[in-house]
Design a protein with these regions (language model features):
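Core segments of alpha-helical transmembrane spans in multipass integral membrane proteins
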Residues: 14-22, 39-63, 74-80
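Membrane-embedded alpha-helical segments of multi-pass transporters/permeases
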Residues: 21-24, 59, 87, 111-114
Length: 121
């Protein structure tokens, strides 16, 4: 695996860790004042745990340098879906501008993952 892609995976792991922390109920309750909608703790813990699980996967791939194409393809699809959802909810006014910026980060990683997938066929 190329060094740039390992760094990209490590950066994605860090982004996911911060996302998992942001959605954890103790933190998220203070984030509601920033325009994020209120949610039941069950949903917040579910989202937080999935973000963390993907982050651990990114970290593991970066650490071992053993690419798992299926995981990277699923990650690209998930990142793209999140970026589209954040953009859609921002454009109709349901999410604050920060959601658009977060979506741009996810879109960047999705494109980078797809680039790597097509390049290493």
């Amino acid at each position: 695996m190329e060094k740039w892609f390992r760094y990209l995976l490590a950066a994605t792991a860090i982004l996911n860790l911060s996302g998992a922390i942001a959605f954890a109920p103790p933190i998220h309750s203070s984030a509601e004042s920033s325009g994020l909608p209120p949610a039941h703790p069950f949903y917040l813990w579910t989202i937080s745990s999935w973000i963390l699980i993907f982050g651990v996967g990114y970290f593991w791939l970066a650490l071992t340098a053993k690419p798992e194409r299926l995981f990277i393809a699923a990650a690209a699809a998930a990142k793209l879906a999140i970026a589209v959802l954040l953009f859609a909810f921002w454009i109709v006014g349901d999410l604050p501008l920060i959601a658009l910026f977060v979506g741009c980060g996810d879109l960047f990683f999705a494109i980078a993952f797809m680039y790597w997938l097509f390049r290493t066929r």
